[in-house]
Amino acid sequence: MKKTWLITGCSSGLGRSLAKETLKQGYNVVVTARNTDTIQEIVDQYPQSALGIALDVTNQESIRNAVKQAIDYFGSIDILVNNAGYGYRSAIEE
C-alpha cells in the first residue's frame, strides 16, 4: 500500500517542489494551500495520487477539516510535512 504524505504550504517554493517530487516517486500526496487555485496544476497532473485541499494553518477548524478530508480520501496520513509558514509583518520600529 502506498504511503500518504500531507504537505502544507504547497503553493510555491519548497512545499511545491517537495509535493511534485514525492508524487513523481509514486506516493499519495495531500497537497495543501490557502488558495487551491495555486495547487490545481499539481492535482491535475496527478489525478489518482494527489488531493488538493484548502488549508489555513492558523485556523484550527481548517486543520481539522483538512485532516478529515485526507483520511476520508486516502485512508490514512503516514507522513506530515509542516512546511507552511505564518508571519506577522510590521515595521522594525514596532
Language model regions located:
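Conserved glycine-rich Rossmann-like NAD(P)H-binding loop of the short-chain dehydrogenase/reductase
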Residues: 25-41
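Conserved mid-core segment of classical short-chain dehydrogenase/reductases
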Residues: 87-94
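Conserved glycine-rich cofactor-binding loop
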Residues: 9-13, 35
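Aromatic pocket-lining residues of Rossmann-like dinucleotide-binding sites
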Residues: 22
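Conserved hydrophobic beta-strands of the Rossmann-like cofactor-binding core
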Residues: 4-7, 80-81
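The beta1-alpha1 cofactor-binding region of Rossmann-like NAD(H)/NADP(H)-dependent oxidoreductases
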Residues: 55-65
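A conserved hydrophobic alpha-helix of the Rossmann-fold in NAD(P)-dependent oxidoreductases
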Residues: 39, 63-70
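A glycine-rich helix->loop->beta "capping" turn
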Residues: 48, 69-82, 88
